Structure formats: C-alpha cells, structure tokens
C-alpha cells in the first residue's frame, strides 16, 4: 500500500 518500509513491516 502506501509508504515503503511501513508496508514491508505489515507483510
């Protein structure tokens, strides 16, 4: 989704 690092953390 939006945001680079934030998206990976949710994955």
Curated annotation (Swiss-Prot):
Q: Does the keyword Oxidoreductase apply?
A: no
Q: Which family does it belong to?
A: Belongs to the FARP (FMRF amide related peptide) family.
User: Where this protein primarily resides, as one coarse class?
Assistant: secreted
Q: Outline what the protein does.
A: FMRFamides and FMRFamide-like peptides are neuropeptides.
Intracellular or extracellular location(s): Secreted
Keywords in UniProt for this one? Amidation, Neuropeptide, Secreted
Leucine amide PTM positions? 11
- Disulfide partners: none
Give the GO biological process terms.
neuropeptide signaling pathway
A single GO cellular-component term from the record reads:
extracellular region
**What protein does this entry describe?**
Extended FMRFamide-9
């Amino acid at each position: 989704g939006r945001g680079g690092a934030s998206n990976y953390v949710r994955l």
